[in-house]
Amino acid sequence: MNRTLLKKAALCCGLLIASPFIAFGQIHEGGHRPDWNAIDTISFLSFNDFHGAFVKDRNVPGAAELVQAVLDEKAKNKNTVVVSVGDNFSGSYFSRITRGNPLPEMFREMDVKMSAIGNHEFDWGLPYLVDTAAVCMDYIAANIVAKDDHAPLEWLEPCKMVVQPLKNGGSVKIAFVGLTTTDTAVKTRSENIRGIDFVNPVDAARVQVATGLKKEGKVDMVVLLMHIGTDMSNPDVIEEENAKRLPWIEGVDAIISGHSHKVVLAEVNHLPIIQAGVNGTHLGKLNFEVKQDAGKYTIQYIGGDTIRVAGKGNSVIDSLVNKEMDKYGFEEVLTMAENDLIHDRNINKKDYTTVGAYVTASYADTFRKYSQISKKYGKQSVVGVNHYGGLRASILKGEVTCLLYTSDAADEED
């Protein structure tokens, strides 16, 4: 495995070498030499586990507000790099019916540089991910390889570099290394991940850094973009056992995480780790001071923030969402709810809830209807079952529309 990963890393590093950056000390166009004593700030802005939450709801800001929040933050610092940490499109009824639209336009509006691959990226099958999603955005994952021989995948790069210009005329080269939870192998339909394997994230990340991203001066910073869960209540912050050593890899400057839907801002081994909730409720922001002295960069973490997304929506994205709403009749009223029916992963995830009862009853009723079990066997008991993590939304008081189906996150292709 290590030999294969080294091969892939070498390929990635070769791409980095070919990138259009300017070597230290060179005179720039017009005879301008960088001011090596200047101080600048680079910000990493991230969101994760959007899950196709395009439509604004009581606890969900919607795509338009998320995009506008990103643009507002970028206006504060032009040296801002925007990234996604995976689980982008699957998880809402709206997104399933629209096939992920308008996610491509949304990413372009925010200038999202790349995305980690989340476990739910495979919900609609590998052909969709390879032929549609990966065409619209740059996915990266260093620990996803071919199952038979652990060879690199043609459609997937382990890392990507961003060359960020600075105000003095210089530039900082930042390598993002993608990682995906190895739980994907057991939590995803086998046919949706046929032919690929998920290897140890620490080994994969260490290979990427050790092959020279930092040591040979190819990049100035290395950021792990990982769809692996983190939680402030966990003593190690990183939840998965095979990923806990990631903060101790020499040469890594920051970890931007997703998967566990938590709001996280922490430091482990003096390394900043951030996660920005779920459904676009928050943005994660990490700030680094870049000081240039005698032709060398000194880069230091100076703080971060988890920003609640709220406020006006972006008119371009709002128009696109409304267009899809009208096209598919998502606002058709099915019934009325007299009270809020709450099923919240952070409140009563493992409790009996009315939402859970309705969803599982619908499974049983549908089975009775289409199997014609009563005609074949007479009166029979049918039990509908869903695991407690499978329900993702409440049913709120008032008009209940077709978007009700977002409550059931069983969003894989049939």
Task: Report residues per predicted region.
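Bacterial N-terminal signal peptides that target proteins for export
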Residues: N2-A10
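Bacterial N-terminal signal peptides
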Residues: C12-P20
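Acidic, metal/ion-coordinating pockets
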Residues: Q26-V309, V355-S362, T366, S374
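A short C-terminal boundary segment appended to hydrolase-like catalytic domains
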Residues: A38-I39, S171, A185-V186, V290-V400
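Glycine- and acidic
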Residues: G52-A53, S190-N192, L341-K349, S407
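Charged, often glycine-rich, active-site loop that binds/positions anionic groups
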Residues: R96-T98, K397-C402
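Conserved small/polar residues in nucleotide/adenosyl-binding loops
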Residues: Y405-E412
